[in-house]
Amino acid sequence: MAQISLTFPDGKAREFPAGITPAEVAASISTSLGKKAISASVDGRHYDLQWPIETDAKIAIHTMADEAQALELIRHDLAHIMARAVQELWPDVKVTIGPVVANGWYYDFDREETFTPEDLGAIEKRMKEIINAREAVKTELWERARAIGYYEERGEPFKVELVQAIPEDQSIRMYWHGGWQDLCRGPHLQHTGQVPADAFKLMSVAGAYWRGDSANKQLQRIYGVAFKTRDELKAYLHMLEEAAKRDHRKLGREMELFHLQEEAPGMVFWHPNGWQIYRTLEDYMRGRLRQAGYKEIRTPQVVDRKLWEASGHWEAYKENMFIVEVEEEHAKEKRINALKPMNCPCHVQVYNQGLKSYRDLPLRLAEFGSCHRYESSGSMHGLMRVRGFVQDDAHIFCTEDQIESECAAFIELLSSVYKDLGFDSFEIKLSTRPEVRIGSDEAWDKVETALENAIRKVGAAYEIDPGEGAFYGPKLDFKLTDAIGRKWQCGTFQVDPNLPTRLGAEYIGEDGAKHRPYMLHRAILGSFERFIGILIENYAGKLPFWLAPRQVVVASIVSDADPYVAEVVAALRARGVRAEADTRNEKINYKVREHSVGKVPVILAIGMQEVEARSVSVRRLGETRTESMGLDQVVDQLAADARIPG
């Protein structure tokens, strides 16, 4: 029998018969590993323990201790177990697809009746019975005709369509347990009992069109979440409860920040309070960019298709653009424009005005650029996913030798900004060259090394995401962690030699010849709309004093105190504090409750005692005690707190 060489993570290699399975490899290492093994990685591919290995390869055996692989298998198996449970409870239901998604999985079903909360409970119960039965999970490769016949016989039209879409020369992998079979690429666990029965929960039912096309039949999508332990599930459910309390849409209403409506889907109507947050954040970012050597520009929102064709965006992105056709006077044809979905091609146009020398580089151009992208109605979510948004966008035009220093400076700026905004930790992911790419390996080596050196220079930790860079260059993604442990990808840093070439950007080098600059796309917040949503949820509406839209309310206890209330408000406003008077004929406790719901950080209560002493009674948001302070003292303190950082 032919032999193959398998190389293990420690670098050691062993000979095995061709066709050996990872399960057999694990058992050959130790009885214990053979029992604990759940899957393998073979040449970087996640591999089922039952699949044969036919050629030399690098191999790693995975156990439940390997978080990523274990969760993928648990969630994938639960998708199959749920589909089986549904069909055992309601045999007429048709199954479609059930992938793993963040924190869990979903499966789409074709059923006449709507799934109810009681149905979800029954499905969960049957799933636990299947898990506790510890049934073996088996797999086979079938010929295409056999798979089609199998599903046609069982009246599963969606599965027939899926099989028919697979190339004719490919075999079909089938998995089954307990007599229930499903078409699947795998891998899976070895028996249903390996799935933790107390660490999953069915969460919700939603509508979904077959293959995501509204012209197709609408299905019912059941979502589930799953973890390795019951405690992890409980922690996740607690986080969801906290997230519901912090929902920026709910707080946006309570704080009178913004609204959205059907006449302008995905476009934000900012109210005075919300617009104040927006403008304060913009002023803060403008100051930080100015300090970092950026020059602010403004570019058009409506741009002729010719520029988008030249940049390559028309071909790749047209479906997500808002197209505007205009009948120009004396023109034979309509002019086709688009609302810009991104700012980068316009920034190259600014760069291209006038001859540039190497002495002009790096040139950092920043814009709070309004962009519009068509997002499907089902994907939009408050401020987090909109069609009209503003990016804190900037592009750095530089030489290859300047990439490392510019990247390091950007990471330091991003870190400082996140810290000012209350996010002390973030993750960096470096996405490296994909298989399909432009440029030489030598050029990729230089740029990837420059990014790694920049990260190390600032002392940051990072992970590498192999092959996930753009076809023209590597990129960095920055994920911050909020108060309840959720991660948000906001910042980006993308190296791009392609767009300057497409749009004719040049500079004169030290040698007197023309050269192409590198273009570094970078953002810190991502979009103002989404980042404000993140801020609201991170702080549960209790924004830092400098960022709060209404910083102080000065509330009268008796009407005779109204003149002094006006004096206090005027003194605060003169020092840059956003202060309002509340002299309504209402009890002070009512006023305090109302402004606390509105998340006003400081309420100054004033009665005749405060008038006579020229003092104020200070109540801070979330505290029950009050503090008496002199007028000058409180004005000085609040004026200092109101200053924008940086």
Curated annotation (Swiss-Prot):
Keywords: Aminoacyl-tRNA synthetase, ATP-binding, Cytoplasm, Ligase, Metal-binding, Nucleotide-binding, Protein biosynthesis, RNA-binding, tRNA-binding, Zinc. It catalyses: tRNA(Thr) + L-threonine + ATP = L-threonyl-tRNA(Thr) + AMP + diphosphate + H(+). Its EC number is 6.1.1.3. Zn(2+) binds at C344, H395, H521. It is found in: Cytoplasm. GO terms for biological process: threonyl-tRNA aminoacylation. Its main location: cytoplasm. Residues 247-544 are annotated as: Catalytic. GO terms for cellular component: cytoplasm. The keyword Aminoacyl-tRNA synthetase applies. PANTHER family: THREONINE--TRNA LIGASE, CHLOROPLASTIC_MITOCHONDRIAL 2 (PTHR11451:SF44), THREONINE-TRNA LIGASE (PTHR11451). This is Threonine--tRNA ligase. The lineage of its organism: Bacteria, Pseudomonadati, Pseudomonadota, Alphaproteobacteria, Rhodobacterales. The gene is thrS.
